[in-house]
Amino acid sequence: MKANWNTHTFRCGHASGADEDYVKAAIRAGIEKLGFSDNAPFRESFPGQRMDYSQLQDYRESILGLKKKYKNEISIHLGIEVDHYDNQLEDMIYYRKEMEYVILGQHQIEYQGMSSYEIFDENGLGYYREHIAYVCSNGLCDMIAHPDVFLWAYPKLDGTVKQASAQIAEIAAKYNVPL
């Protein structure tokens, strides 16, 4: 079965086009299941990285409307992609209840103000891994997107990276969360 579970919309600021255009393109490509999982809004604004709270209702209504409109042509699912922040656990719990599925895409970590794309030392890598472990062990996501984003800035493919990667895979397997 051809499926795409990580489709963003213009609301996140780094995708473009109308929601319905994604549905039509998926149908043309033979996709059978199309999951929309735009970057979730959180209390702190991240323009260009995630939708704003003011867009959440429109997102839900649009995707659910398309799900109904195209129900005989493609299976459409309403999801969300989240980052884990200690101070926004309520939001994650809300999304877990309100969406069909939740993807963990840990772009930011609360370690020296870094994004996951800027991890350059073992401590940052460990902190990134712990975020993933926390979310998986508490049942707050259904899958993990791009678990390797730390490789963007980590200076070398060393034993620490290999160990952290193996540990992330073990965490995902332990909690039955696909990568």
Language model: regions and residue ranges:
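Catalytic domains of carbohydrate-active enzymes, especially glycoside hydrolases
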Residues: Y22-S37
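Short amphipathic alpha-helical segment that frequently serves as the phosphate-/nucleotide-binding helix
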Residues: S16-E20
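Histidine-centered catalytic micro-motifs
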Residues: K2-G13, F36-N39, I144-V149
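Extended substrate/RNA-proximal surfaces in nucleic-acid metabolism proteins
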Residues: Q49-Y175
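Short, conserved active-site loops that position catalytic residues or coordinate cofactors/metal ions
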Residues: L34-P47
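Conserved, mostly hydrophobic/aromatic
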Residues: N6, A26, V102, H146, ...
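Hydrophobic "anchor" residues on beta-strands that sit immediately upstream
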Residues: K2, L34, H77, D142, ...
